[in-house]
From Swiss-Prot:
It comes from Rhodococcus jostii (strain RHA1). This is Putative pre-16S rRNA nuclease. Gene3D superfamilies: YqgF/RNase H-like domain. Residues 1-21 are annotated as: Disordered. Pfam families: RuvX. The keyword Cytoplasm applies. GO terms for biological process: rRNA 5'-end processing. Belongs to the YqgF nuclease family. Its EC number is 3.1.-.-. SMART domains: YqgFc. Could be a nuclease involved in processing of the 5'-end of pre-16S rRNA. The lineage of its organism: Bacteria, Bacillati, Actinomycetota, Actinomycetes, Mycobacteriales. Keywords: Cytoplasm, Hydrolase, Nuclease, Ribosome biogenesis.
């Protein structure tokens, strides 16, 4: 799917069903990574991967994230698509889109989706600040916190979509799941 001109993906459409999801916040210097539990309810931080200067499917950052996808036996990867509040895209969106395309080639057939990530880094920074983490202390974990926010938003929307019967796929929540 070419995301250059279209909007972000919708959770629940062509849903792969139960399994872990990996959330990715692509920055120009670092990449935040988060994972969900197998039931797709809760997102938690995994690690921060340094961006590599190399570009291509075998670049160290792509390889590390592909290893995480395999290690966690992920059924889906969610990459944040930064947009302005008006839905416009700038350089950050282009960086994320190109990265997602490279990752998609590396982890195929695992689907790589793009999720709206307006204000996730701002929200993550505010949450860290409110929990007492200094601005200097935020740097190593801000990208992970943003990845958690991206993935948790996807999981919450997926839950609403699946419960509404809007999956377009074989999505199922666990018994008693919401």
């Amino acid at each position: 799917m070419d995301h250059a001109e279209q909007g972000p993906d919708r959770p629940g459409v062509d849903d792969p069903g139960r399994g872990r999801r990996i959330g990715i916040d692509v920055g120009s210097v670092r990449i935040g990574v988060a994972s969900s539990d197998p039931d797709g309810i809760l997102a938690t931080p995994v690690e921060t991967v340094p961006r590599s200067k190399e570009r291509g499917p075998d670049a160290p950052d792509i390889r590390r994230i592909a290893d995480i996808v395999e290690e966690y036996e992920a059924v889906e990867v969610i990459v944040g698509l930064p947009q302005t509040l008006r839905g416009e895209r700038g350089k950050a969106a282009s960086i994320a889109t190109v990265f997602a395309k490279r990752l998609r080639r590396k982890v195929d057939p695992i689907p790589v989706r793009m999720a709206d990530e307006r204000l996730t880094t701002v929200t993550a920074a505010r949450a860290l600040r409110e929990s007492g983490v200094s601005a200097r202390g935020q740097r190593p974990v801000i990208d992970q916190a943003a990845a958690v926010a991206i993935l948790q938003g996807w999981l919450d929307e997926r839950s609403r979509s699946v419960n509404a019967g809007d999956s377009g796929g074989d999505a199922q929540l666990p018994e008693g799941g919401q």
